[in-house]
């Protein structure tokens, strides 16, 4: 095999597929990136058997062939080459020569046919959304997944396709995040649980342009994202996702309309008095036109008042400040509406059209104070 391409194209391609290289594996071939020049297109692939990424890069194929190269070494070499044309050539003994200007590297390769190719997916159905929308949906929900492997379903996000709407749900036992996106074409109802790791890595690759589309197709076991000459194939998480509909009540005793930035900044200031790992709640006292926020820790105490518009009853309630901050940070609206029932029931932050819903459980601030 012998190919030529620009350093910038190679760096971009390697950066994309490297996200599917496992940090630990018992199969050395999976620590490699496959360079496939057996057709008229140069393809780079990495695969950890749960997540696989393939991307095409432009360049010249002089001799067809393929080779697998250690991803870490290859990535570091490519990144530090001069900004010029790169030639990659494999010899009969699988030694791979990488040259750029006067720099020349000679490294060992592995047979390309030993590499774990991406599974060929018989696509059952597909949806299309813009890269901008998918990137935003991930940003606005991913913080609510659990990092505990003890409950695998909580480490993923539910993609619930129903009535021409994609509803994305994440939860960790303390909060639920929901984003709804209307779909342009009619597809059959389907529920898929996508690993959080997959979505985090996809979010890093997406350009985020509104005019660029992502095609999302799926089977019983896999989901495929196709965009910008890149294919991402991921295993789905098995099992039935949690039923949350009974938790999403529209009833409330107190409704608060408040400036999002003011509330976020106030809670952010309050957390200055909380050490990492210290579970001190922020206590919120809702009155007629004012919301008072208080926090007390070993470091000190703080209280602040914010103007609000309120409907319904006064309320005293406590929350983990981090959970409020996480939700408020990803809401783009200037004002937010918060719905509350009592000090023991979850609060809901949502817009009028319910394109986003954030459910956050309160904490017992008497016991925690």
Which functions belong to the PLM regions below?
Residues 1-369:
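Structural preference for solvent-exposed beta-strand-turn elements
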């Amino acid at each position: 095999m012998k190919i030529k391409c620009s350093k910038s194209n190679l760096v971009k391609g390697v950066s994309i597929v490297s996200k599917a290289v496992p940090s630990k594996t018992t199969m050395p071939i999976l620590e490699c990136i496959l360079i496939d020049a057996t057709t008229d297109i140069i393809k780079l692939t990495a695969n950890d058997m749960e997540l696989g990424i393939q991307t095409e890069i432009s360049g010249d194929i002089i001799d067809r062939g393929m080779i697998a190269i250690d991803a870490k070494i290859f990535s570091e070499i490519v990144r530090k080459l001069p900004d010029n044309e790169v030639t990659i050539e494999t010899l009969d003994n699988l030694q791979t020569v990488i040259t750029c200007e006067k720099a020349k590297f000679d490294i060992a390769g592995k047979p390309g046919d030993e590499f774990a190719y991406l599974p060929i997916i018989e696509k059952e159905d597909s949806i299309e959304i813009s890269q901008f929308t998918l990137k935003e949906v991930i940003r606005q929900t991913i913080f609510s997944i659990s990092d505990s492997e003890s409950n695998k379903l909580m480490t993923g996000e539910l993609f619930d396709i129903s009535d021409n709407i994609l509803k994305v749900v994440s939860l960790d036992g303390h909060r639920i995040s929901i984003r709804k996106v209307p779909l342009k074409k009619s597809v059959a109802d389907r529920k898929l649980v996508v690993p959080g790791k997959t979505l985090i890595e996809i979010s890093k690759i997406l350009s985020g342009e509104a005019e660029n589309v992502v095609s999302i197709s799926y089977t019983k076991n896999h989901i495929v994202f196709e965009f910008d000459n890149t294919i991402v194939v991921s295993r789905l998480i098995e099992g039935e996702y949690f039923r949350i509909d009974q938790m999403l009540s529209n009833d409330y005793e107190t409704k608060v309309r408040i400036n999002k930035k003011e509330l976020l900044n106030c809670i952010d200031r309050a957390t200055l008095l909380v050490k990492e790992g210290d579970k001190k709640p922020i206590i919120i006292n809702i009155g007629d036109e004012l919301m008072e926020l208080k926090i007390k820790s070993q470091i000190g105490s703080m209280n602040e008042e914010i103007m609000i518009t309120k409907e319904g009853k006064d309320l005293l309630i406590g929350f983990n400040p981090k959970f409020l901050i996480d939700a408020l940070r990803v809401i783009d609206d200037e004002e937010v509406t918060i719905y509350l029932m009592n000090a023991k029931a979850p609060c809901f932050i949502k817009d009028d059209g319910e394109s986003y819903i954030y459910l956050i459980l309160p904490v017992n601030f008497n016991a925690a104070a």
